[in-house]
Curated annotation (Swiss-Prot):
Domain of life: Eukaryota
Enzyme class: transferase
GO MF term (any one): ubiquitin-protein transferase activity
Pathway: Protein modification; protein ubiquitination
Cellular compartment(s): Nucleus
Similarity remark: Belongs to the WD repeat PRP19 family.
Assembly with partners or alone: Homotetramer. Component of the multiprotein assembly MOS4-associated complex (MAC) at least composed of MOS4, CDC5, PRL1 and PRP19 which is related to the PRP19C/Prp19 complex/NTC/Nineteen complex identified in other organisms. Associated with the spliceosome.
Lineage: Eukaryota, Viridiplantae, Streptophyta, Embryophyta, Tracheophyta
Disulfide feature: none
InterPro entries per the UniProt record, alphabetical: Pre-mRNA_splic_Prp19_cc, Prp19, RING-Ubox_PRP19, Ubox_domain, WD40/YVTN_repeat-like_dom_sf, WD40_repeat_dom_sf, WD40_rpt, Znf_RING/FYVE/PHD
CDD domains: RING-Ubox_PRP19 (cd16656), WD40 (cd00200)
Location of the U-box domain: 1-70
Reaction equation(s) it catalyzes: S-ubiquitinyl-[E2 ubiquitin-conjugating enzyme]-L-cysteine + [acceptor protein]-L-lysine = [E2 ubiquitin-conjugating enzyme]-L-cysteine + N(6)-ubiquitinyl-[acceptor protein]-L-lysine
Annotated protein name in UniProt: Pre-mRNA-processing factor 19
Length: 527
């Protein structure tokens, strides 16, 4: 009398009328409630088809093995043998699993190495392809038949115009629509933007002091000439007299990579967060576009040689698809970033002054340039026409910065900083932080438009006010390089720190002591 489900002697046996099978009542009831079928034959079955089996009420006898001591010892011996066999089987399974895991880990390591190699080969192939794409048009133009002019000379009519200048494709209507749409969107967003509550307060900035110093450039050619901060990754890029650009991770205090390729000092550089690109301009008359890889390295994908003199400034448009370079050859170039092509090169026939600084307006339709002749020029990007000129500086305009409020422009020169109201096209304030022999080398608004940083013989931070109110000095940070020449000043996110570059090789971070615990172990260096 064995239950057809459990294989045990049932305590409350029942029989199916249809199949005649014996079941434990509680088991078959539960199965019928869930499925409505016989658990063995799968026929339709209800509780009405189940008949209870009447048995005698007797005491269940004890098993013979448990009725004596020898029987109990035999049972224990059998149980022990079963446990030993099970343990042996488990040890064998564990050994097999360890072997399989070791094999899988070796396979994973080999796969990772192969993937890394393939990625490296892919990046190299991309760089070669981009270089080939730039070389093919030039080679095709060189191989194309040329027209013979009356004096017997040959000219490339598709590249050079009658005036001897290269013919550029220009900014087409589609690009103009894109620039206009970007301007409309950013302008509307800027008007709604409020000062973030996380912005560093005046009291906090008054307590700023040097929290770290990092030797990034060579000792035999010291000097940081340009600087930029990645808007989302807290990476600081510096360009030096040693011809190198260094990418520095501020939170970890480590150098991510050093970009080499220019033959002279790097005068300007900018991040292009879109597609992890990076642009550098140099005194060697070239501009390089660098492509970042997943491993953190940067490869040069374009080398642009459209200028005939030192490239002094690089500024990236808000769309992150275009950028402008300004040079001492008295021209500025508008580039398409993906193709690395110069869409237009703008120069003025009158005057021989070169450009020393340039910056896009935050909304993107206005470009500001500073010249060696102390003139600030405002350009309409869509038409490439000079729409305004600001005069009054003494010496070359070394730096400029548009405020995020959209209507303040700060420019720096030998005589200090001049503040311009773009709504009325006039100078409403002049800040002269240093004596007449000390030029102002850097000027920078923070992203909120609440503070203005000035770099010269030291670093000074001013509170931004309106046209009528005084712009108060908040903090003076000494130049700890010993050179007496601060060349670059940049605000970190929410003005939580200030990055300063000087004519030594060290990048210095000023902030509130204790706010950046990750930088506490960094050793200051005054070499």
């Amino acid at each position: 009398m064995i239950c057809a489900i459990s294989g045990e002697v049932p305590d409350e046996p029942v029989v199916s009328k249809k199949s005649g099978l014996l079941f434990e009542r509680r088991l078959v009831e539960r199965y019928i409630e869930d499925h409505g079928k016989c658990p063995v034959t799968k026929e339709e079955l209800t509780m009405d088809d189940i008949v209870a089996v009447k048995t005698n009420k007797v005491v269940k006898p004890r098993q013979l093995q448990a009725a004596s001591i020898p029987g109990l010892l035999g049972m224990f011996q059998n149980e022990w043998d079963a446990i030993m066999l099970s343990s042996f089987a488990l040890e064998q399974q564990l050994h097999t699993a360890r072997q399989e895991l070791s094999h899988a880990l070796y396979q994973h390591d080999a796969a990772c190495r192969v993937i890394a190699r393939l990625k490296k080969e892919r990046d190299e192939a991309r760089a070669l392809l981009a270089q080939a794409e730039r070389q093919i048009p030039a080679s095709m133009a060189g191989a194309a038949p040329t027209a013979v002019v009356s004096n017997g000379k040959r000219a490339f009519e598709d590249e050079v115009g009658p005036d001897g200048k290269k013919i550029r494709p220009g900014i087409n209507p589609v690009m103009i629509d894109e620039l206009t749409e970007c301007n409309t969107m950013l302008s509307a967003h800027r008007k709604k933007r409020q000062v973030p509550p996380t912005l560093a307060s005046i009291d906090a900035i008054e307590r700023y002091t040097q929290i770290s110093s990092h030797p990034l450039h060579k000792t035999n050619k010291p000097g940081i000439l340009s600087m930029d901060i990645h808007p989302s990754k807290d990476i600081i890029a510096t360009g030096g007299i040693d011809t190198n650009a260094v990418l520095f991770d501020r939170p970890s205090g480590q150098i991510l990579c050093t970009l080499t390729g220019h033959s002279k000092k790097i005068t300007s550089l900018k991040f292009v967060p879109r597609d992890e690109l990076f642009v550098t301009g140099s005194a060697d008359k070239t501009v390089k576009i660098w492509q970042g890889s997943e491993e953190g390295n940067y490869n040069c994908i374009h080398t642009l040689k459209d200028h005939t003199a030192e490239v002094e400034a690089v500024t990236v448009h808000a769309t992150q698809k275009y950028f402008v370079t300004a040079s001492k050859d008295n021209t500025w170039c508008f580039y398409d970033i993906p193709s690395g092509s110069c869409l237009t090169q703008v120069g003025e026939s009158s005057g021989q002054e070169g450009y020393t600084s340039a910056s896009f307006h935050p909304d993107g339709l206005i470009l500001g340039t500073g010249t060696t002749e102390a003139v600030v020029k405002i350009w309409d990007v869509k038409t490439q026409s000079n729409v305004a000129k600001f005069e009054g500086h003494v010496g070359p305009v070394t730096a400029m910065s548009f405020s995020e409020n959209g209507y303040f422009l700060a420019t720096a020169a030998l005589d200090g900083v001049k503040l311009w109201d773009l709504r009325k096209l006039r100078n409403f304030r002049t800040i002269s932080p240093y004596d007449s022999d000390t030029p102002t080398n850097s000027v920078e608004f923070d992203f909120s438009g609440s503070y203005l940083a000035v770099g010269g013989s030291d670093t000074r931070v001013y509170q931004v006010a309106n046209v009528k109110l005084e712009w108060n000095l908040v903090k003076t940070l000494p130049d700890l390089s010993g050179t007496g020449k601060v060349t670059n000043v940049k605000f970190g996110t929410d003005a939580k720190y200030i990055a300063v570059g000087s004519m030594d090789r060290n990048l210095r971070i000023f902030g509130h002591p204790g706010e950046d615990d990750q930088m506490d172990d960094a050793k200051p260096s005054e070499e």
